[in-house]
Structure formats: structure tokens, C-alpha cells
């Protein structure tokens, strides 16, 4: 399972943010966050969304303990998103049937990151979502850093 996991580990969230009592950036409710994530998804070019096929986007508060352990991430605030599946370059028509690939957006770490860095939450959601979509298309973290640096 660990070999199928790709991570987005921001590395910028301090351990001090492990307290749930910290102030969070807008949106504050889970429904507001899902609405913002849906708006980001809808803003992506249609051709791009269509190329994703049956990839599911799921919003959860934090990564589960099993995922954090598998990735050796000890502070749950350090994982903003995760692509779970086999990227397109690694799939074959001969593969056995699988569950749909999934992109997880971790709501509370994203809100914390936005607040800590003075960024709009929708911009952080967009960055994380596009980053995880990049993994679906076979890009590594290093590949995406090069793309972002040249943009």
C-alpha cells in the first residue's frame, strides 16, 4: 500500500499547530470547505477534468493514523493532501479491477496552513488539488517543483 501513496507534505506547519484550539482561516465549517473545494474543481478546465476519468476527490479533516504511519509523518498538520492510486503512466489494461483513484484534501491542515501563511484558503486548496492531480498524471514531487519554479 505504501508504494501506491504519493504525498504532499508541506513541511511548513510547526508542531505548535497540533492544538485544535488554534484560529483557522475561512471557511470555518466543513460544508463551506467542501463548497470551496467544489468551486476550485469546477474552475479547472473541462478537458482537464474529463481526463481525470473516475478520480474521486474526498475532503476529510485529517489523514488517518494508518496513512500517517505509512508515510512516516508524525504531525498530522504536515499532510495537506494525498493522491492514492496508480498514476496513469503505471496503469495497464491488463491490471485487475481496482477501486477508483482518490485525492484526499485534508481540511484542517489546509485551513491551518492558509492561516499560518496568510493565504486565501481557496488558493491553498487549488495548489494542493493541482499537485495531487499531477501525481495522477505521473509527475513526482520533484517534477512539479520544477514546473512551478519555471512558471
Where are these predicted regions, by residue range?
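Catalytic glutamate of the conserved HExxH
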Residues: 128, 132-136
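Active-site rim/adjacent substrate-binding subdomains
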Residues: 2-124, 136, 140-145
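N-terminus-biased detector of the onset of the functional/mature region
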Residues: 150-151
Amino acid at each position: 500500500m505504501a508504494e501506491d501513496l504519493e504525498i504532499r507534505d508541506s513541511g511548513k506547519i510547526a508542531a505548535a499547530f497540533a492544538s485544535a484550539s488554534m484560529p483557522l482561516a475561512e471557511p470555518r465549517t466543513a460544508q463551506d470547505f467542501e463548497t470551496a473545494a467544489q468551486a476550485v474543481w469546477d474552475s479547472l478546465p473541462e478537458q482537464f477534468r474529463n481526463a481525470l476519468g473516475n478520480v474521486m476527490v474526498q475532503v476529510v479533516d485529517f489523514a488517518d493514523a494508518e496513512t500517517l504511519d505509512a508515510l512516516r509523518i508524525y504531525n498530522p498538520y504536515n499532510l495537506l493532501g494525498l493522491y492514492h492510486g496508480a498514476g496513469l503512466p503505471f496503469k495497464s489494461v491488463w491490471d485487475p479491477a481496482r477501486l477508483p483513484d482518490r485525492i484526499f484534501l485534508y481540511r484542517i491542515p489546509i485551513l491551518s496552513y492558509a492561516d499560518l501563511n496568510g493565504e486565501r484558503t481557496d488558493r491553498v486548496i487549488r495548489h494542493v488539488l493541482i499537485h495531487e492531480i499531477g501525481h495522477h498524471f505521473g509527475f513526482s514531487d520533484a517534477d512539479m517543483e520544477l514546473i512551478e519554479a519555471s512558471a
